[in-house]
Amino acid sequence: MRRPGTLLAAAVVAAALILTAAAPSGAITFGQPDGNRHPYAGALLADWVPDSPGPDVFCSGTLIAADVFLTAGHCTSFLEEEGISPVGVTFDPAYDENAASPDGILSGTVITHPDFGFSGPGGASDPHDMAVVLLDDPPGITPAQLPTEGLLDELAEDNSLRSATFTVVGYGTVREQKTGGPHGILPIDGVRRFTLQTFQSLEPAWLTLSQQPSTGDAGACFGDSGGPHFLGGETSDLLVSITVSGDAQCRAADKTYRIDTASAREFLGEFVNLP
């Protein structure tokens, strides 16, 4: 969610913990360890916790080409201004945040959507909340699939979305209890997790998914921002949206940013071949 934000602590805690009615998203609620189900889902890293020995998870994302990692714009827009560098990516399903020199961290160049922003004309309706990390070296992982243009609109027209299952993956905070409010949210532990969701609503730039435990759904929380939402069950690799926002309790709804729109595809097309 727009839930990753001292300065990275303030910025990441600001970028990640802007928990209002529409707060950025973090970790998976009521989920389970992903293992190798979604090897192309990764975590965005930076050394932002003063007493931590190595780089820390602050957002999630997805490999969408051999060397292109997609995440959310609110995860990266403040990095240069706050002097947060370097930024890395890991695809380790159980990243060790307590290691001084963790293995497998990939370096790269961050590019935030030039029109990113939640203010100004059309800001909330289409914030262009996207960014990519152009990896210096490909990880040798088969990327996730991207959707065709307008796929979700087509599914909405024939009512397929109403019965569709979605899978969310991320490295964020964890909720395992249905009660307890914010106190029921556990800290990031470096484990990639997944869970399933159902459809709630579709807007021109947004796909809102249920994470109501009362209806058997679950979803994203702090630190899952930028992470993938796949159309289909736990074996699906068809990426249709990314985690951007949700509710402060991480148990009502995920508001995700669509990547099948002409607007999103215009940005993505600068870095990958689109279907």
Predicted regions and their residues:
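Hydrophobic residues in beta-strands and at strand termini
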Residues: 44, 63, 71, 91, ...
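A generic structural motif
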Residues: 45-50, 92-94, 169, 230-232
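Conserved catalytic-core segment of clan PA serine endopeptidases
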Residues: 28-37, 77, 82-153, 187
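Chymotrypsin/trypsin-fold serine protease catalytic domain
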Residues: 126-130, 134-217, 255, 261-269
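Solvent-exposed loop/turn segments at secondary-structure junctions
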Residues: 48, 68-70, 75-77, 117-118, ...
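Secretory targeting and sorting signals
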Residues: 1-27
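C-terminal subregion of chymotrypsin/trypsin-like serine protease catalytic domains
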Residues: 28, 34-40, 56-77, 83-95, ...
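Short, solvent-exposed aromatic-acidic interface loops
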Residues: 111-116, 211-218, 243-248
